[in-house]
Curated annotation (Swiss-Prot):
HAMAP family associated with the record: Phosphoglyc_kinase
Annotated ATP binding sites: 206, 325, 352-355
Assembly, per entry: Monomer.
Stated name of the protein: Phosphoglycerate kinase
Annotated positions binding substrate: 21-23, 36, 59-62, 119, 156
Gene3D superfamilies tied to this protein: Phosphoglycerate kinase, N-terminal domain (3.40.50.1260)
GO molecular function: ADP binding; ATP binding; phosphoglycerate kinase activity
Membership in a protein family: Belongs to the phosphoglycerate kinase family.
GO cellular component, one term: cytosol
Reactions mediated catalytically: (2R)-3-phosphoglycerate + ATP = (2R)-3-phospho-glyceroyl phosphate + ADP
UniProt-listed InterPro entries: Phosphoglycerate_kinase (IPR001576), Phosphoglycerate_kinase_N (IPR015824), Phosphoglycerate_kinase_sf (IPR036043)
């Protein structure tokens, strides 16, 4: 069933509550990457144009004790958003109370107000993170309709997403709509052939994704640290490379039952120490010495993965191919990123997290059909789970 989107709502003159995802990195009071704010703009601008009185909610970081509040205020977000919109964003440094209620009552059509970090409510019994029913009800009482545009927290059942939805007509914002269309589309109705590329350090982080994707993807290309548990499961020596002993049986079973779908590295770059300055050797996957560890996939693997991608109609990528934060071990990730970016007839999707950061930093942002804003949310969606934040949005 299709979900309601913001354009299905009558917004003029209404107090529109919106859950956005402004969980951006802030250092010394300065936002170091405002991509999430940029992604939120289409929905915010639409609500303003339609004459809604916009009240924005978001969390920022984890608030465990009173001293955390100082560095986790949303005030820098209000300033950044204000510049982008070319108008004042009223910032209320409270999450409830008379000051907030009065500020909302005084809003005019097209005004924008940002409520302080919703996780400040976690200092009192984790009311936000545990979806305290009274808090959700209180926030809902401040508005007329609710728009959820925070895919990054769609896998969480919080007061500021699911809690508010319980009491108000709820629609998806444009960013949430895109995530449902593309990430949800991979799971529910992908255009075949489908190729999935999985990387990152641990098999354990991706087990449920793999279990779901073997029923969807024609090929699953595995790189990153997680590949070496599979290579060990084939009976090969992996030296000091990353290994999850307790996942070898899972890897063996998968290779036995779905071996024709799984594509593993054929070569890698190894080093004796975990450092960007370490001496690099390129070796076949069968020749990793006992005193060295694999830090990146090699050029032959990049070539192999590129070959496997040709002819795909849907490609989903989650996780880097090596220790991407070290420039000398980033070539595998860069190579795979370039291969996907060059595909002309495919829907290409990055499932958030480190791969999204890699594609953006490499300047390939515009070459992908969709780069997800959710890390954990993307993974859980790819696992085939129904996400609470999406479930709570009204059907059309």
């Amino acid at each position: 069933m299709a979900k309601k989107i913001v354009s299905d709502l009558d917004l003029k003159g209404k107090v529109v509550l919106e859950r956005a995802d402004f969980n951006v990195p802030i250092k010394d009071g300065e936002i170091t990457n405002d991509n999430r704010i940029v992604q939120a703009l289409p929905t915010i601008e639409y609500i303003i144009e339609q004459g809604g009185k916009l009240v924005l909610f978001s969390h920022l970081g984890k608030v465990k004790e009173e001293s955390d509040k100082e560095g986790l205020s949303l005030k820098p977000v209000a300033e950044n958003l204000s510049k982008k919109l070319g108008k004042e964003v009223i910032f209320v440094p409270e999450t409830r109370g008379e000051k907030l209620e009065t500020a909302i009552e005084n809003l005019n059509e097209g005004d924008v107000l940002l409520v302080e970090n919703t996780r400040f409510e976690d200092l009192d019994g984790k009311k936000e993170s545990k979806n305290d029913p009274e808090l959700g009800k209180y926030w809902a009482s401040l508005g007329d309709v609710f728009v959820n545009d925070a895919f990054g927290t769609a896998h969480r059942e919080h007061a500021s997403n699911v809690g508010i939805s319980t009491h108000l007509e709820t629609a998806a914002g444009y960013l949430m709509e895109k995530e449902i269309k593309f990430i949800g589309g991979v799971v529910n109705d992908p255009q075949k052939p489908v190729v999935a590329i999985l990387g990152g350090a641990k098999v354990s982080d991706k087990i449920n994704v793999i279990k779901n994707l073997v029923n969807i993807a024609d090929k699953i290309l595995i790189g990153g640290g997680m590949a070496y548990t599979f290579i060990k499961a084939q009976g090969k020596e992996i030296g000091l490379s990353l290994l999850e002993e307790d996942k070898i049986d899972f890897a063996k079973d998968l290779l036995e039952n779905n071996g024709d779908q799984i594509v593993l590295p054929v070569d890698c770059k190894i080093a004796k120490e975990f450092s960007n300055d370490a001496k690099i050797t390129e070796v076949s996957i069968n020749e990793i010495p006992s005193d060295q560890e694999a830090m990146d996939i090699g050029p032959k693997t990049v070539e192999l993965f590129n070959k496997e991608l040709q002819g795909a109609h849907t490609v989903v990528w989650n996780g880097p191919m090596g220790v991407f934060e070290f420039s000398n071990f980033a070539k595998g990730t860069i190579g795979v990123c370039e291969s996907i970016a060059k595909l002309e007839d495919a829907t290409t999707i990055i499932g958030g997290g480190d791969s999204a950061a890699a594609a953006i930093s490499l300047g390939f942002e515009d070459d992908f059909t969709h780069i997800s804003t959710g890390g954990g949310a993307s993974l859980e969606y790819l696992e085939g789970k129904e996400l609470p934040g999406i479930k709570a949005i009204n059907d059309k």
